[in-house]
């Protein structure tokens, strides 16, 4: 049956009266980050692993960005704008893995972060948390909370698309700009997290408070500890599936925590209580889940919380100034 022009779905497909002529703010952020990291890649070409693949990857993403802009110019509707945003967000995983290639230029700093945790707490919470809380319910809840990270982002973006369309570009700009701000930190400050570092140096040394520097060890190693807790639940299997594409990178500060905080702020700013209180339990549990599964040190969580708020304030101010 043909779709009626006054139907609810038609407004997402009809041509916008004032379509965006240029690139969206989030696309400019991606292009700027692409340029910065391309310069690093070219200057350090002989020191990087597979630099040619890094360069071609950037060329492809630039081509995709321009192609989607052209398609939107031909069919400037709401759905096409959302598709532009969705495609860029679907590439975040590629960019995350790319930070591993770039930060291999620098020595690993896990020993510093692990030492900070030890000094603050007198132990390694990332080691003891899962050892003391082994009940299947605890394990399953925290595993599911951890993997709810990307669904939370999708829910926020979808809500703004369907219910706050005039604020969609601003909300997605803040999320994407914050992601790439985290990625820039990961590029320059390599921390892999307990599941990699503990595996590399051995649990015996960790238990005795010994945290040796391991230099460029992770340039040639990516072995990690298996997820702790109950091994026969849906959350565990989802976590294992996610870890299949993991890289020893991106632990400090925790982007999981930072982006979760940003999503909570965006949910609160939407003035929709149902949205906010729906994601609140998952977002809060992410704080604990990152330590439970040994993806992060506790210091990473605190840093992610603070940096997430800073990034929100920064990019929200930029969005308002640029009228996104």
Language model: regions and residue ranges:
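Interfacial helix-loop-helix junctions of multi-pass membrane proteins
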Residues: 193-199, 251, 285-311
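Membrane-interfacial catalytic/cofactor-binding modules of polytopic membrane enzymes
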Residues: 188-269
